[in-house]
């Protein structure tokens, strides 16, 4: 099954990634990806792009060769209050805001602190998707996080990269997250967390977990471009309005 949406990618603007926007578009066309989000790391990361990078994302075209591009960020959760490293009206210029824990910005501490920080991020209203919440370096109260995400309409990510090149040992946590999401009605999304274009749309390990717990396809944001765009519009991203008509006739892949 080929999903047509990938919400989590990094370009050479984050210097530990290796592909350009052009590279991603080329691979998207090859793989049948119709919509992807450009979500480079937030400015608090040492090798992240400058703040101006995110302000100027508006120069990216909406569609190139039939592939839609979302202008976004993977922000960093900075503290227990759930603050992130992007702010104010600038957030409104973005189509999609991801956020997660990253060791160089917010070192791991303990389960209670991680849980409070993640839930406060969810409650802030600034973040659409929590990235790699299954990271074993940051244990959380999974049920509490899933309940909060369901209540505030924030999606939790099943991060495919966590099973391949980073965050080793995430499988059990991600399975528990998927089960809790199924129970509490939490929205899930699969993210490739691609740092090279060849990984775009690579969801095999994440999909195996989704299938294992029989998570409802109707709540999975990857099911169609229109599903993701409707989610973002409902969360107040007026910037996606010009993309919505371009995908109005799409069909869910599952």
Curated annotation (Swiss-Prot):
Positions annotated to bind Zn(2+) 1: 8, 10, 74, 193
Transmembrane annotation, as ranges: none
Keyword Lyase tagged: no
GO CC annotation terms, alphabetical: cytosol
Zinc as UniProt keyword: yes
Keywords: Hydrolase, Metal-binding, Zinc
GO BP, sorted A to Z: bacterial-type flagellum-dependent swarming motility
CDD domains noted in UniProt: PHP_HisPPase_Ycdx_like
GO molecular function: phosphatase activity; zinc ion binding
Disulfide bonds: none
Residues that hold Zn(2+) 2 according to the record: 16, 41, 195
Pfam families: PHP
Cofactor(s) recorded in Swiss-Prot or TrEMBL: Zn(2+)
Gene3D superfamilies the record matches: Metal-dependent hydrolases
EC number: 3.1.3.-
Cofactor note: Binds 3 Zn(2+) ions per subunit.
Binding residues annotated for Zn(2+) 3, in chain numbering: 74, 102, 132
Family per record: Belongs to the PHP family.
Official protein name in the record: Probable phosphatase Sbal_1472
Highest classification ranks of the organism: Bacteria, Pseudomonadati, Pseudomonadota, Gammaproteobacteria, Alteromonadales
């Amino acid at each position: 099954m080929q999903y047509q949406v990938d919400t989590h990618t990094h370009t050479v603007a984050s210097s530990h990634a290796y592909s350009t926007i052009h590279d991603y578009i080329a691979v998207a066309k090859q793989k049948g990806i119709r919509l992807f989000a450009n979500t480079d790391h937030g400015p608090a990361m040492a090798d992240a792009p400058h703040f101006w990078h995110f302000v100027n994302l508006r120069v990216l075209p909406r569609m190139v060769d039939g592939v839609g591009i979302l202008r976004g960020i993977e922000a960093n959760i900075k503290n227990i209050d759930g603050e992130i490293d992007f702010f104010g009206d600038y957030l409104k210029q973005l189509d999609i805001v991801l956020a997660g824990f990253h060791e160089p910005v917010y070192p791991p501490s303990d389960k209670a602190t991680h849980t409070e920080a993640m839930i406060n991020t969810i409650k802030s209203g600034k973040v659409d998707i929590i990235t790699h919440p299954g990271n074993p370096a940051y244990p959380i109260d999974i049920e509490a996080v899933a309940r909060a995400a369901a209540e505030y309409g924030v999606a939790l990510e099943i991060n495919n990269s966590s099973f391949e090149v980073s965050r080793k040992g995430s499988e059990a946590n991600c399975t528990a997250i998927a089960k809790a999401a199924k129970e509490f009605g939490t929205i899930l999304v699969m993210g490739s967390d691609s740092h090279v274009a060849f990984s775009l749309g690579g969801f095999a390990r994440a999909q195996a977990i989704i299938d294992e717990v029989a998570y409802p396809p109707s709540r999975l944001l990857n099911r169609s471009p229109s599903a993701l765009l409707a989610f973002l519009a409902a969360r107040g991203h007026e910037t996606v309005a010009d993309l919505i008509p371009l995908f109005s006739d799409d069909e869910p892949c599952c």
